[in-house]
Design a protein with these regions (language model features):
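Targeting-peptide/extracellular-domain and disordered-appendage signature
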Residues: 1-218
């Protein structure tokens, strides 16, 4: 049976986090860490923007990509319950990673300096099962990408987060007989981490990220 979790009138604790930064501070799992470490060793971080000062966020534009930065991600997690009392959790993340700064020199539909990778997990807390899947793609030929305007959309193949109306985002991802199809409605203003969204990792200038959360979506 295909598991599809749809928010209708459920109590949901969910959030979106967007982070963009140019320094490698670690990663969410071994595979993504290996990708980042390989990129840094081969190409370094020279030429990319740094999170080195407080900025004024502009939404919805800042929900979209910031290609001057080497890395950013769109991160969703939530807890769900159904009418029978079953409990579920989910996580859906799309990462963008630049290999080199700037635009590719050659003109081709396939040319890119950006790669995207996505993680998708579902936990059946009641049934004590866990599913985890991932995908990788280049940001070319429509295979993967992100935009903030005119409407927010980030995707990798048919896994995506898409604004369907102001303040509402639909998440869709599936693998085999496991999938999510969720509609999240923003209920609170963005929570800015650190100093008005500038989250320092150390005392070194530029060793920081721009980081905000949209919490308590329903």
């Amino acid at each position: 049976m295909r598991l599809v979790l749809i928010i209708v009138a459920l109590v949901v604790l969910s959030g979106l986090v967007l982070v963009q930064y140019n320094q490698v501070e670690g990663a969410s799992n071994e595979i993504s860490a290996n990708v980042q470490e390989a990129n840094v060793e081969a190409y370094g971080t020279e030429g990319f923007a740094k999170a080195d000062k407080v900025i004024e966020f502009e939404f919805p534009a800042d929900h979209g990509p910031h290609p001057d930065f080497q890395t950013e991600w769109w991160y969703y997690t939530g807890n769900l319950g159904d009418a029978d009392g079953h409990r579920y959790g989910y996580q859906f993340t799309i990462f963008r990673r630049a290999i080199l700064p700037g635009e590719p020199e050659r003109t081709s539909e396939w040319a890119t300096r950006q790669i995207y990778f996505a993680h998708f997990t579902v936990t059946d807390a009641t049934g004590e099962t866990f599913e985890a899947h991932e995908r990788f793609s280049r940001a070319a030929a429509g295979l993967a990408g992100a935009q903030g305007l005119p409407t927010y959309h980030v995707w990798l193949d048919d896994w995506d987060a898409r604004e369907i109306e102001p303040g509402k985002v639909q998440l869709q991802a599936s693998y085999g007989d496991i999938g999510i199809d969720l509609i999240l409605e923003q209920t609170k203003p963005a929570a800015l981490q650190g100093d008005r969204g500038l989250s320092a990792k150390s005392d070194e200038v530029g060793n920081a990220s721009y980081y905000y959360s949209l919490t308590n979506n329903t």
